[in-house]
Amino acid sequence: MMERSVFLGLDIGSTTAKLALVAADGKLLEAQYLRHGAAVRQTLSTMLDQLALKYPGMAVSAAITGSASLGLSETLGLPFVQEVVAASRAIAVLAPQTDVAVELGGEDAKILYLSQGMDLRMNEACAGGTGAFIDQMAALLHTDASGLNELAANYTTLYPIASRCGVFAKTDVVPLLNEGAAREDLAASIFQAVVEQTIGGLACGNPIRGKVAFLGGPLHFLPELRKRFIATLKLAPEEVVPFPNAQYMVALGTALSLVDLPGAARMADMEPVTLGTLAERAPASDAEDRRPPSLRCSTTKPTTICSANATTGTPPRASRWNPRPARSSSADLGSTTVKAVLADADGAVLTS
């Protein structure tokens, strides 16, 4: 068995991919943060290729987390770590003085209460007040998230803006734009809307006090957003926990969940794997990843509308060695009705 000395944490979220390479003593060796633009597997493959080239032959113990990583966990042969577990592990190791952690991601927001037992608050049904919401509002002002931050630094007035939904927010922002409101004021107001959505929608009256850490990409890269949180919560400078690698925090926690640090439990022993092997396992594109089983029509039982022949991946093209099926079927399972169609090789409907 190879020596356990280096640990890799992967965090594949809804809009970004992060990785953290950590030594046995908890020291961060390498970190990456990339927007994947929905090309999840291609981005991950590129990141792992670059890491394998930089550290040839390096063996690591690895784990993965994130909202877009469940299928990749199986593809890469890596254990899946819950985001909350990874986040709390990173905080416990790197900032144990933290009482409350506020984290914003691409499409989720979390508040972790840590000082009196673990209590997690997380948005459930809407991405309002998250990184995706900020991107959408930035586009409305013809800029990006960084541009929104630069504008907000020079604001003079805050306007009330809805943040539960991007559609509702637009109904507030567009009239203000038409009335001549300054873009700087609108940018700061959008950040304030994110703050109010997070505090009002997640804290639900539970006070955010003590030592507070601000985590996740939006709160790391947008200091004006962080300032709006600090001002709204009336935090003194000594109450804000410094977290220099806040954008990698969950990836760090995923790696640290594998590290055998004093006084902290870790995951069960795993056989290390080389970075090159991980890079080879990663599909170069989404098309190469496994697809759900398809439903195929039985040619031996023509009276049966559909039989579930579980075939993983895209059905092969017709050829002389793999003739086109004589019949094919599809089903539409709606909320109140079920529809099914049986068609021949030319697409003509046989029955429905």
Predicted features, each with a name:
Residues 47-60, 198-210:
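Phosphate/pyrophosphate-binding loops at sites that engage ATP/ADP/AMP, CoA/4′-phosphopantetheine
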Residues 68-69, 203-232, 243-250:
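Glycine-rich phosphate-binding loops at beta-strand->alpha-helix junctions
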Residues 189-208, 254, 308-317:
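Phosphate/ATP-binding catalytic cores across multiple sugar-kinase/actin-like superfamilies
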Residues 4-42, 46-49, 120, 124, ...:
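Short glycine-rich, Thr/Ser-proximal phosphate-binding strand/loop in the N-terminal lobe
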Residues 134-136, 243-281:
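Glycine-rich phosphate-binding/hydrolytic loop that grips phosphoryl groups
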Residues 116-157, 247, 256-260, 352:
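Glycine-rich phosphate-binding loop plus the immediately following alpha-helix
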Residues 169-200:
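Adenine-nucleotide phosphate-binding core of ATP-dependent small-molecule kinases
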Residues 26, 30-36, 51-85, 112-121:
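Short beta-strand-loop/turn "lid" adjacent to the catalytic site in phosphate-handling enzymes
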